[in-house]
UniProtKB/Swiss-Prot annotation:
GO terms for biological process: translation. HAMAP family: Ribosomal_bL33 (MF_00294). The keyword ATP-binding does not apply. InterPro entries: Ribosomal_bL33, Ribosomal_bL33_CS, Ribosomal_bL33_sf, Ribosomal_zn-bd. The gene is rpl33. The keyword Ribosomal protein applies. This is Large ribosomal subunit protein bL33c. The lineage of its organism: Eukaryota, Viridiplantae, Streptophyta, Embryophyta, Tracheophyta. It is found in: Plastid, Chloroplast. It comes from Calycanthus floridus var. glaucus. GO terms for molecular function: structural constituent of ribosome. Belongs to the bacterial ribosomal protein bL33 family. GO terms for cellular component: chloroplast; ribonucleoprotein complex; ribosome. Keywords: Chloroplast, Plastid, Ribonucleoprotein, Ribosomal protein.
Amino acid sequence: MAKGKDVRVIIILECTGCARNGLNKESRGISRYITQKNRHNTPSRLELKKFCSYCYKHTIHAEIKK
């Protein structure tokens, strides 16, 4: 039997600080995390505070499109 859309989807979280600084070339790179989210519980874009190895501090990582 065919299922509908999967409830759990794989998402990519990207550092918002590095993404803004990427235009100015101040940062060495962009920190990204791969995780999963439940589409029914969190239909909106996910934002988590995670450690960025390029900024050397905890920053907000937001969900990006694939």
